[in-house]
């Protein structure tokens, strides 16, 4: 007596289900974006929402922070974009556009998810405030050098007068 477990069609279906089980994780992995790809998608969204005349393109991507492996968890990002010569009205990838000379630079921060299916981001951009911070750093370092230089000069003057001995007449 043959049971339905002995039928050849059940064996084929079992094989198909087994293969599907092996292939599905690969399909899920293929939907995960790289950190840079997620940022580029966010820039596309920024360009779509922007009221500026020209497209923006990635200028600098800050180093990727240490992250967990969950592609659905929002990942912090920080990057700068610069205005290109391409008008927003044309259907062109910003990567194909040259940067505009003296184009506006914006500093963007927020979060992105690496799950391509969710494709979510929360980014806000502002004029590049890091330049002001960098200027502050330069001024602070210059001030520190000036203080060290003045201390050095003061020490030399002190040493000079310390070496002078009064002359005695004989």
Curated annotation (Swiss-Prot):
The keyword Thylakoid does not apply. The keyword Disulfide bond applies. Keywords: Antibiotic, Antimicrobial, Cleavage on pair of basic residues, Disulfide bond, Immunity, Innate immunity, Secreted, Signal. One of its GO terms (biological process) is innate immune response. It is found in: Secreted; Vesicle. It holds the Pfam family Cathelicidins. Residues 150-162 are annotated as: Active core. Belongs to the cathelicidin family. The cathelin-like domain (CLD), which is the propeptide part, does not seem to exhibit auto-inhibitory function, as it does not inhibit the antibacterial activity of antibacterial peptide LL-37. Antimicrobial protein that is an integral component of the innate immune system. Binds to bacterial lipopolysaccharides (LPS). Acts via neutrophil N-formyl peptide receptors to enhance the release of CXCL2. Postsecretory processing generates multiple cathelicidin antimicrobial peptides with various lengths which act as a topical antimicrobial defense in sweat on skin. The unprocessed precursor form, cathelicidin antimicrobial peptide, inhibits the growth of Gram-negative E.coli and E.aerogenes with efficiencies comparable to that of the mature peptide LL-37 (in vitro). This is Cathelicidin antimicrobial peptide. The lineage of its organism: Eukaryota, Metazoa, Chordata, Craniata, Vertebrata.
